[in-house]
């Protein structure tokens, strides 16, 4: 088969929308947003049993966080915990994991981060174990085309502040990181962007593995992938998180309780 180059990629233009894409979600509280994000990401492969934590920065400087002991596919808004900037529990019915230290250090160093996600996702953890970032082979993988940091000095846990600080330093300005022999870390400004980046990166990890298993392939043109990712980083992917949230609410209407 001959692959024909179509010329130099050109930047995408925003679509003009004159009516809604689909039914709107009800007005959500921050805790409801976090619960929906956890459910959506569980469906995408962020599903390692009790592992994983999501922090959602609030205007008053506190953070919402999922509790330890509940899987992401059973989390409801009423389960969501609140902690201060040092990781101390302020409110909620359950317990906050000691491993939240990584998020505490991240938020102290990166004031641009509104949402931080850590889990041992099914496909991302494979590449964390390999110790390198996968190539981008398709458009969905390119929805996040920023830097992927690889932190390869894993000491067995990140609940020690020194280890967490080392991971944050190694990450720099990247918004996605592979923690070698551990898992994935995704940072974003808000809930919708967090879902987009986490979903896209897990998709990328899965597709790259399948392409390699099939004998290899040609990665997406880097400039085209960058244009595509930059566009959706700027304009968001209107309706994406809402559609996936509606899917989860169809499965379990009690998420917002």
Model-found features: residue ranges?
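Glycine-rich flexible loops
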Residues: 2-257
């Amino acid at each position: 088969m001959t692959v024909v180059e179509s010329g130099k990629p050109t930047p995408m233009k925003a679509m003009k929308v004159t009516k809604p894409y689909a039914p709107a979600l009800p007005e959500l509280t921050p805790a409801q947003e976090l619960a929906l994000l956890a459910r959506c990401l569980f469906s995408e492969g962020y599903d390692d049993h009790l592992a994983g934590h999501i922090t959602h920065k609030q205007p008053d400087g506190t953070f919402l966080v999922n509790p330890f002991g509940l899987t992401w596919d059973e989390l409801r808004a009423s389960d969501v915990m609140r902690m201060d900037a040092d990781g101390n529990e302020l409110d909620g019915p359950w317990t906050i994991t000691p491993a939240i230290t990584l998020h505490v250090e991240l938020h102290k160093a990166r004031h641009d981060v509104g949402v931080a996600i850590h889990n041992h996702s099914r496909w991302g953890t494979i590449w964390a174990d390999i110790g390198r970032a996968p190539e981008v082979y398709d458009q969905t993988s390119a929805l996040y085309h920023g830097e992927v940091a690889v932190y390869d000095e894993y000491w067995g846990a990140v609940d020690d502040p020194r280890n967490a600080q080392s991971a944050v330093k190694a990450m720099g300005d990247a918004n996605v990181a592979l923690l070698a022999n551990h898992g994935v870390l995704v940072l974003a400004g808000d809930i919708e962007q967090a879902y987009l980046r986490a979903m896209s990166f897990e998709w990328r990890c899965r597709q790259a593995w399948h392409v390699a298993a099939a004998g290899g392939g040609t990665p997406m043109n880097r400039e085209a992938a960058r244009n595509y990712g930059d566009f959706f980083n700027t304009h968001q992917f209107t309706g994406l998180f809402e559609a996936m949230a509606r899917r989860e609410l169809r499965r379990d209407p009690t998420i917002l309780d």
